[in-house]
């Protein structure tokens, strides 16, 4: 009888050990081994938006640093970053290659509204995470229709509504001229702006002009806006065209109050080419620390950023805020992968990406926290207004929440 009891105890213990081992069993999706996590993205390393290519390079640099420190739970991050020339058909081709040939676990930070729109249905049908896309289009936060797609930065509509409210409070009689890219990116900004102005939009907006990404310049559009009598200019353009618009408006003597979308606020990539003296007074929003701001010269996060750039991306421009943006997103992904533990399946990647609670990324502005949930796919919803003083962006006002 006692022997029987002893055998029952032993069998129970063995069963418990076995079930524990099963519980701790590693679960891997495509692209994952005991030593590697393979992910992919496309970036415009060539073409009209090539200024954004540095984002991919800064993310690769950050992951190299993480890998040198031992990786994530012993696994190194292998980011395959391919050029799509800011051309959606090329994006589709490259993403299919990453998913079907390279067998990446997920896509990360693919850049561009049109580019991500072109691959969204494909990736969701394949149940491949389209994670932290490098675009602020509002549609990236729709977990009901697209549960495998998540944005990262503040939405374009939220941003443009902030500008609208600012004008209503400080310049309610403004005559506004708008220049925007003729695609979903530009139209998303414009929708938010008009929504923010409400019933005053029709009266306050006196001119709307567009440009195509393939255009050589936007000089003629700026002349048109000047001729409209606008005294306020909402500049919804990518870096190349933003610099042209700032420079042209100054050179022809048109000096409106200028609102500049956040995707073109890089001092190195936009304002220096335009002319720093021609950029004084520009207003935008910020959410990452600006490496050109002397306020952060002793900030540990900015010092760490500069050290990473020096060691892992020495050819990169440390004054380009696109680089500190890239590293900020990379830090967010590292947290997601840490939360995944040894369950590195596509399903768990999305589960953990949608389970970020008051995450503090040191390179974000003080007070900004990243929060997501299964019903909230908008990680960053706090921003602050900023104004360019000829040398750097200066924050003003309080943190604004969506």
What are these regions (language model features)?
Residues 1-38, 400-402:
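Short, low-complexity disordered leader/linker segments with a strong preference
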Residues 23-40, 68-77, 168-175, 343:
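Immediate post-signal peptide segment of exported/extracytoplasmic ligand-binding proteins
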Residues 25-27, 36, 51-57, 68-142, ...:
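Beta-alpha junction/loop-to-helix N-cap segments that form part of ligand/metal-binding clefts
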Residues 27-60, 82-89, 111-112, 179-188, ...:
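Extracytoplasmic "Venus flytrap"
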Residues 84, 131, 138-141, 213-214, ...:
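Venus flytrap/periplasmic-binding-protein-like
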Residues 89-93, 100, 138-141, 147-253, ...:
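Extracellular/periplasmic Venus flytrap/periplasmic-binding protein
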Residues 249-325, 399-401:
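Extracellular/periplasmic periplasmic-binding protein-like sensory domains
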Residues 311, 315-324, 334-393:
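Segments of small-molecule ligand-sensing domains
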């Amino acid at each position: 009888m006692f022997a029987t009891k002893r055998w029952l105890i032993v069998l129970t213990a063995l069963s418990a050990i076995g079930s524990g081992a099963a519980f701790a069993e590693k679960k891997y999706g495509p692209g994952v081994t005991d030593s590697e996590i393979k992910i992919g993205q496309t970036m415009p390393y060539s073409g009209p938006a090539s200024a954004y290519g540095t984002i991919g390079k800064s993310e690769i640099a950050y992951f190299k640093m993480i890998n040198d420190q031992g990786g994530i739970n012993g696994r190194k991050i292998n980011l395959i970053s391919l050029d799509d020339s800011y051309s959606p058909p090329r994006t589709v081709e490259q993403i299919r290659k990453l998913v079907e040939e390279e067998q990446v676990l997920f896509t990360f930070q693919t850049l561009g509204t049109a580019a991500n729109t072109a691959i969204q249905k494909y990736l969701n049908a394949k149940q491949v995470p389209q994670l932290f896309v490098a675009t602020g289009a509002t549609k990236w936060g729709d977990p009901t229709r697209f549960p495998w797609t998540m944005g990262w930065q503040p939405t374009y509509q939220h941003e443009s509504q902030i500008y609208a409210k600012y004008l209503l409070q400080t310049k309610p009689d403004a005559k506004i001229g708008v220049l925007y890219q003729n695609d979903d990116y530009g139209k998303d900004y414009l929708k938010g702006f008009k929504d923010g102005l409400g019933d005053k939009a029709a009266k306050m907006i006196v001119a709307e002009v567009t440009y195509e990404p393939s255009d050589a310049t936007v000089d003629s559009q700026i002349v048109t806006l000047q001729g409209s009598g606008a005294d306020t200019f909402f500049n919804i353009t990518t870096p190349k065209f933003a610099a042209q618009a700032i420079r042209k408006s100054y050179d022809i003597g048109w000096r409106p109050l200028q609102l500049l979308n956040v995707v073109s606020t890089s001092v190195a990539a936009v304002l220096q080419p335009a002319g720093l003296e021609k950029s004084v007074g520009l207003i935008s929003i910020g959410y990452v620390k600006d490496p050109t701001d002397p306020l952060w010269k002793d900030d540990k996060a900015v010092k760490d950023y500069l050290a990473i750039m020096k060691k892992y991306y020495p050819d990169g421009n440390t004054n380009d805020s696109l680089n500190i943006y890239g590293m900020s997103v990379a830090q967010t992904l590292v947290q997601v992968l840490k939360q995944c533990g040894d369950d590195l399946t596509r399903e768990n990647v999305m589960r953990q990406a949608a389970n970020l609670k008051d995450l503090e990324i040191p390179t974000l502005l003080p007070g900004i926290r990243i929060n997501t949930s299964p019903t909230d796919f908008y990680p960053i919803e706090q921003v602050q207004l900023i104004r360019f003083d000829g040398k750097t962006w200066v924050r003003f006002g309080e943190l604004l929440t969506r």
